[in-house]
UniProtKB/Swiss-Prot annotation:
Mg(2+) 4 binds at D43, T59, D90. Mg(2+) 1 binds at T60, D61, D138. This is Thiamine-monophosphate kinase. Mg(2+) 3 binds at D43, D90, D231. It comes from Corynebacterium glutamicum (strain ATCC 13032 / DSM 20300 / JCM 1318 / BCRC 11384 / CCUG 27702 / LMG 3730 / NBRC 12168 / NCIMB 10025 / NRRL B-2784 / 534). Its EC number is 2.7.4.16. NCBIfam families: PRK05731.1-4, thiL.
Amino acid sequence: MTLAHSLSFPDSLRDGPTVGDLGEFEVIRVITEQAGSSLNGDDAAVLRHASPNSRAVVTTDMLVAGRHFQLDWSTPEQIGQKAIVQNFADIEAMGARPVAALLAISAPTHTPVEFVRGLARGMNQRLEEYSAELVGGDITSGDSLVIAVTAIGQLGGSLPELTLGRARPGQTLVAHGKIGYSAAGLALLQHFGPDNVPEHLRPLVDAHCAPVLTPGRGMVARAAGATAMTDNSDGLIVDLNQMAMKSGVRIDVDSSSISPDELLSEAASVLGTDAWRWILSGGEDHTLLSTTFGDAPSGFRTIGQVTKTRHEDLVTVDKKTPAFSDGWRSF
C-alpha cells in the first residue's frame, strides 16, 4: 500500500469520480463552479486598490490532513471555512480588509472530486461574508492532502498597520471573540469521536471544525486607535508573549475577564480536566487580541493591561505566572 492510499475518505464522498479520473483542468472547473470570480481564469489575477494610498497585505497558511484536520471529524465544507478564517484572521489582525484568496491543493489521485467540491463551497461561504473572492490557485498530485491558502487584504488610509511591536505601557488589552472554545471542541472529539459528542456541547466542536470571525473587526479597532494586534491561533499566552517580546513590555491578563463560561465549565467537568488549559494554551480560536488607549473598540472587551512592571514572565495572569503556558507547535 502506498502512502497516498493510506489516506481514507468518508464513504459519503466516494460515490463519484476522483481527481485522478478528472484531471487538473476539470478539477479546477469544479472549484470555480463553487467559488467563481471574474478575476479567476487568466495566468494571474489583477487586483485593483480601493484607494490611491491603499497598501496590500498578504499572508499564507497551510492545513495538512491528520495534522490540522481529520477527515472523519470535519466535513469538506468545514475544512474550507476553516482555511479561509485562519488566513483572514491574520489580515484582520493587521487592521486590513480581506479582499481575495488563492487556493493551492496537493492531493492523492484517489481524492474524491466531491471532497474538492465541498471544500470550495465552504471556502466560498466564508468569502461571501467578506465580499471577497477566490481569484486563482493551483492543484497537483501528492502523497499527502495539503491545502494552502494565500490571503490578500487592503490597508487603506494613513493610519499605521497593527503590528505586534506597538504595544505600550499604560494601554489596555482587548479581545474580540471566544477564547478556549476550539481547544475544548478538539478535546471532545478526541474523547467521544465525531458522532457521540453530547448535543449541548456541539457548539464547541463547531468552533474547532469551522471557526467564525466577524468581518471588519480589525478595521474597527484600527480606526478606533488600536496599536498592536494579533489573533489567538497558537494559544493565548504564546501569542501574547510574542506581542510582549516584540513590544518590549509586560502584559497582565485579568482572569475574571476570560474565566470559563458555562459551556466550557460543563465540557471540563465531563472530561475531568481544567478548562483553564483550553483558555490559556488552546489556540485556534482566531480571537483578535489588541492593545489600545482608552475604552475597548466596538465589539471588543477589556481583558488586561500593558505594563512595564518587572516580572520573570512577559505575560502574567492576575500578576502571577500563568498556570498553563504551552501552545501549538508546528514541529
